[in-house]
Design a protein with these regions (language model features):
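Bacterial N-terminal signal peptides that target proteins for export
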Residues: 1-12
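Intrinsic low-complexity/disordered segments
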Residues: 2, 23-24
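Subset of outer-membrane beta-barrel
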Residues: 26-309
Length: 309
């Protein structure tokens, strides 16, 4: 079968939505390198050792499809006196004619469950701005009243929570980044912008193969109302506390290759490539994701964390 060089995702998505009689807001962004920036999906996670970190990420999904998802994100987080975590999560997500901008403040509190095991409880609160520009793209039904608008804007509150339990070599977590099921009437009861709940379960274990080599298998399960669960299984290796290599499989969706490099004591860069195996894989050249993390100087004791997560 000849694969078209470029197709319009706007047309495909809007054709389906019109037939369903419902406009859905963008769901939360998808990340392949979530293990390097867990705070994006769990407000209970922050870096340890009395320091802040700032992470920039960029994801271009389904290269070759016009209007495919594109995500830019900034996360800043840290812990004070090994007890209180503070941070912000900001992202901008584009797909077809729709754009979402989200800004959240994050607070977490750490508890010692034992000498080796800690637990963090986290909350996030903020606001999501949503826009649909109906002037973009071509539509199946040009006479639909919904598309007579030039633009649609809305702002919706967001409140989430999470829990993160960990030791030096393992972790488990549970989070709901937005517990509010938001919806807004566009024109009639059948045309709604809304977001379903996202629930994340995560876990990982670090195996010390030698003094300079660590192996970390991990899993992330994401469930969304009225949709099948998404399961990410990954395996990452850390060499000399400097280089990371990994592979990941998103069940029935994609295979991924990951690489990271600790450029200096304060800078880390990561890259991932997703090869799509779903039906839409016939029409795209994969997905790219880049992250850049800056570890700010410590303001407390200069103890190096043994964690590889």
């Amino acid at each position: 079968m000849k694969i078209p060089q470029k197709i319009s995702l706007k047309l495909l998505i809007l054709f389906l939505l019109i037939n369903l009689g419902e406009i859905m807001a963008q769901q939360l962004p998808q990340y392949t390198q979530y293990m390097y920036n867990t705070a994006t999906i769990n407000p209970a996670y922050v870096n340890e050792n009395n320091r802040m970190d700032a992470t920039l990420s960029y994801r271009a999904q389904w290269i070759g499809i016009d209007g495919a998802p594109e995500t830019k994100a900034l996360t800043v987080s840290g812990i004070i006196n090994n007890k209180i975590g503070l941070g912000i999560n900001i992202f901008k997500d584009n797909i077809g004619p729709s754009t979402e901008f989200s800004s959240n403040a994050v607070f977490s509190y750490y508890l010692n469950l034992s000498k080796k095991v800690k637990m963090s409880l986290g909350l996030n609160a903020g606001i999501d701005f949503f826009e649909v520009d109906y002037s973009k793209g071509s539509y199946y039904d040009q006479d639909d009243i919904l598309f007579s608008y030039d633009n649609y804007y809305n702002a919706l509150p967001a409140v989430g929570a999470g829990i993160y339990i960990f030791s030096d070599n393992w972790y488990v977590g549970f989070s709901v980044p937005n517990m509010l099921i938001n919806q807004s009437n566009v024109e009639s009861d059948k045309n709604l912008i809304h977001r379903d709940n996202h629930v994340y379960f995560m876990g990982g274990y670090v195996i010390d193969l030698s003094a300079s080599l660590k192996l970390k298998p991990s899993i992330l399960v994401k469930t969304i109302d009225n949709a099948p669960p998404t399961i990410d299984a990954s395996l990452n290796v850390l060499f000399l506390q400097t280089f990371t290599l990994g592979a990941s499989h998103r069940l029935k969706d994609s295979y991924s290759a990951l690489a990271g490099f600790q450029i200096s004591k304060n800078f880390f860069m990561g890259y991932s490539y997703d090869y799509s195996i779903s039906d839409i894989g016939n029409y795209n050249q994969g997905s790219h994701e880049i992250i850049l993390k800056y570890l700010m100087p410590r303001w407390g004791p200069n103890a190096r964390s043994p964690r590889f997560f």
